A protein has these predicted regions:
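Short beta-strand "acidic-cap" motif of Rossmann-like dinucleotide-binding folds
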Residues: 37-42, 146, 168, 244, ...
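Beta-strand->loop->alpha-helix junctions that form or flank phosphate-binding loops
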Residues: 42-43, 65-68, 103-107, 239-257, ...
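Short internal beta-strands
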Residues: 37-45, 222-226, 357-358, 377-386
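Residue-level signal for inorganic ion chemistry
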Residues: 31, 79, 120, 149, ...
Length: 461
């Protein structure tokens, strides 16, 4: 199916687009250009959306439902939902029960994409892994379209793609939930408790992650983390071939680490790929990210290209990103760390105990393990955001906590917390923003949080 034929297949149907986020805007433009009248629903008020934008949308043929009642009275035949809106929301469930098609911009892209697709999901590491896969393919000479949760929306790019290109997608549990997708290669980096403020249960979250491979068919390839009990168990449900990556075991097929060396394994026969210490990005979690990417591109990207990218790629913004060193103090931005496991991985990647700034939006994830790791690996702790008290409790209740060696301050204002952390630092210290929480308490997303941190740090004298 082409993009044109997909858009034409909607002829005669009433359509609503829920959420005016980045991914839905090109979709909306395609629908309007095709002459459809579209209902646009967004939880923002008209004032928050902006009068100019609201008027422009109405002039283009949109009917707007904004604010608190934006989900009321859904009678349309086709519903494009924003990824952050759970499909079991009562209004959506009722619409689906009466026969409405509940879909998304990303599901539409899978339907029309003419090229091969590698899709990546996971609780942690998916953005870096997705980016590494893209870099590997580009370095091998392939044309790559990077999208999903990163890059740009790809639906309107489909006409530019050919069968020899690659689309590399980062997919969240929100996007995957109830979505029909058949990537040629699926990657699940790991699964740990996350987004439990949205998903009704941890089991529901796991089920969403499995959607990335369940419809693949026998020709598909799924790459799984052998060291994560949940993803390891996913293998029995994979309809196609399975490759594992591991720091702990040597899989029959996949990529693994043994005594500092990364190996490929094909039917039990291992060949050396590279020394792990040659990877420019710091930390064992990045070794895992590379192993996942190497497994996904096995047979597509040469070993020489794998080594060249690993030795030169400097990483993605907001992921253990060194911003500057001032008066001997180094400032590191790990705003992407929106879960305890991600912050723990960052702490393990560093070669010294940082002054840590943590806290943010509450996703109802336990902080017990984080408390122990903070006691082991942090010099001083500055807490901010909605979860400050929860993290404080986890740290101070840890049997490893010693108030004499780990000072803790709780500061409501993010800006003030950063300034206080900087003021406490001495030459040789590292100040690390790694919140262990989402950003939605005070920021639109982790990017805005990271850029705010960068701005504050760059203004320091």
């Amino acid at each position: 199916m082409t993009l044109d034929s997909y858009i034409q297949s909607l002829h005669g149907k009433s359509i609503t687009v829920i959420g005016l986020g980045v991914s839905n805007r090109p979709l909306l433009r395609l629908l309007l250009d095709a002459g459809y009248t579209v209902s646009v629903r967004d939880k923002r008020t008209r004032e928050a959306l902006g009068e100019d934008e609201a008027a422009a949308l109405e002039a283009a043929g949109c009917r707007l439902m904004l604010g608190d009642g934006y989900l009321a009275g859904i009678t349309e035949d086709v519903i494009f939902r924003t990824p952050g809106l759970h499909p079991f929301t009562p209004e959506l469930a009722a619409a689906k029960a009466r026969g409405a098609l509940l879909t998304s911009e990303m599901e539409a892209f899978f339907a029309v994409c003419p090229c091969r697709i590698i899709a990546v999901t996971g609780s942690d590491g998916k953005t870096t892994t997705t980016t590494i896969i893209s870099e590997l393919l580009k370095a091998q000479g392939h044309r790559v379209f990077l999208g999903g949760n990163i890059g740009t929306p790809l639906l309107n790019k489909a006409p530019e793609m050919t069968s020899t290109d690659w689309a590399v997608l980062e997919l969240s549990s929100f996007q995957l939930h109830s979505m029909n997708c058949r990537p040629d290669i699926a990657v699940v980096t790991n699964v740990s408790p996350n987004h439990l403020d949205i998903h009704p249960s941890y089991e529901d979250y796991q089920t969403a992650k499995k959607q990335i491979f369940l419809s693949q068919g026998c020709a598909g390839v799924t790459v799984l983390n052998a060291d994560n009990a949940i993803t390891r168990a996913f293998a029995k449900d994979c309809p196609g071939k399975v490759r594992f990556f591991s720091r702990e075991t040597a899989p029959e097929n996949g990529v693994f680490l043994r005594e500092g060396v990364i190996y490929r394994s094909h039917n039990g026969e291992k060949t050396k790929l590279m020394d792990a210490e040659s990877i420019l990005l710091p930390g064992l979690h990045n070794v895992e990210n590379y192993m996942a990417a190497f497994a996904a591109t096995d047979g597509i990207v040469s070993d020489d290209t794998c080594r060249a990218v690993a030795e030169s790629f400097r990483g993605v913004a907001h992921r253990l990103e060194m911003i500057r060193t001032l008066h001997g103090v180094t400032y590191c931005n790990d705003s992407i760390a929106s879960s305890p496991t991600r912050t723990i991985a960052g702490l393990h990647a560093l070669r010294q105990k940082p002054i840590l700034i943590a806290g943010g939006y509450d996703k109802h994830i336990p902080f017990d393990k984080l408390g122990d790791e903070v006691c082991r690996h942090v010099k001083a702790l500055f807490l901010t955001g909605f979860t400050a008290e929860k993290i404080y409790d986890a740290v101070t209740k840890s049997p490893l906590y010693d108030p004499k060696t780990l000072p803790i301050r709780k500061i409501d204002d993010f800006h003030e917390a950063v300034l206080a952390a900087a003021a406490s630092a001495e030459a040789g210290d590292l100040v690390l923003l790694s919140p262990a929480c989402a950003s939605f308490d005070h920021f639109k997303n982790f990017v805005e949080r990271g850029e705010t941190f960068r701005s504050i740090v760059n203004e320091l004298k």
